[in-house]
Amino acid sequence: MISYYFQGVALGAAMILPLGPQNAFVMNQGIRRQYHLMIALLCALSDLVLISAGIFGGSALLMQSPWLLALVTWGGVAFLLWYGFGALKTAMSSNLELASAEVMKQGRWKIIATMLAVTWLNPHVYLDTFVVLGSLGGQLAMEPKRWFALGTISASFLWFFGLALLAAWLAPRLRTAKAQRIINILVGVVMWLIAFQLAREGVAHMHALFN
């Protein structure tokens, strides 16, 4: 059964490691050294719930409803475009240091609310956890399924805590205005690239739906 665990770790890592809204938020909180470990924990716990729901039944529900899948897909496109626009707008700000200072004034509960929005209101997360991980893990028998789920969840915990700690360690170099501008441009461009790729999949899905 241990092989299913490592399959889960490998696939979970492949899904979690690419830059996305969650990773960008955890990284930025680590750079600011502002509740970064708490945010990493909440992200990992959110993934635990989403991955478990996807593998143990949620995937079948989503895949059996083409219109719901289309809604999630295009919702993901809109969310990623909006998030990318925000990052690029921050990067192009004439006074990036002032903008960063304003962010640093945010309280714990506002940061938690932002993290929950980035995770739970991001339809792209449901595609990863329900469609990809859920469809693969859902095909397994119950015991291998549990090990597979444990592997994907382990990858999530290791990644988010590792990212938060690494960002905090590199904070002196990454907190400069130049570094922040580069990071925000990178985040914005990647979000838009993912959105366009998802839009292509959405168009193909809609074409199949109407034919």
Swiss-Prot record:
Q: Name one GO molecular function term.
A: L-arginine transmembrane transporter activity
Q: Which Pfam families match?
A: LysE (PF01810)
Q: Which HAMAP family match?
A: ArgO
What protein name is recorded for this chain? Arginine exporter protein ArgO
Q: Where in the cell is it found?
A: Cell inner membrane
Organism from which the protein derives:
Salmonella paratyphi B (strain ATCC BAA-1250 / SPB7)
User: Which parts of the chain span the membrane according to its record?
Assistant: 1-21, 37-57, 68-88, 111-131, 147-167, 179-199
Keyword annotations = Amino-acid transport, Cell inner membrane, Cell membrane, Membrane, Transmembrane, Transmembrane helix, Transport
Q: Per the annotation, which location comes first and is thus the protein's main one?
A: membrane
Q: Which GO terms describe its cellular component?
A: plasma membrane
Q: How does it sit in the membrane?
A: Multi-pass membrane protein
Q: Which family does it belong to?
A: Belongs to the LysE/ArgO transporter (TC 2.A.75) family.
